[in-house]
Amino acid sequence: MLGWVVTFLVVALIAGLLGFGGIAGASIEIAKIIFFIAIVLFLVSAVISIFRGRTRV
């Protein structure tokens, strides 16, 4: 699951860079939402993995 979160985080970062850079002005709000959701999911998955003691990514 952590692998999927990292994948979506990378996609959100790319979308955020395009959105914040003014290239895709209409998608700025969507990129912001996806970016923050991906960060939250990444942090939750990382914390759960740490507490379970698994080192899989």
UniProtKB/Swiss-Prot annotation:
Pfam families, per database record: DUF1328
Membrane topology: Multi-pass membrane protein
Keywords of the record: Cell membrane, Membrane, Transmembrane, Transmembrane helix
Source organism, top-level taxon: Bacteria
Keyword Transmembrane helix: yes
Principal subcellular localization: membrane
Family statement: Belongs to the UPF0391 family.
InterPro entries the UniProt entry points to: DUF1328
Protein name, entry field: UPF0391 membrane protein RPA3505
Transmembrane stretches, start-end: 4-24, 30-50
Species per Swiss-Prot/TrEMBL record: Rhodopseudomonas palustris (strain ATCC BAA-98 / CGA009)
Subcellular location: Cell membrane
GO cellular component term, pick one: plasma membrane
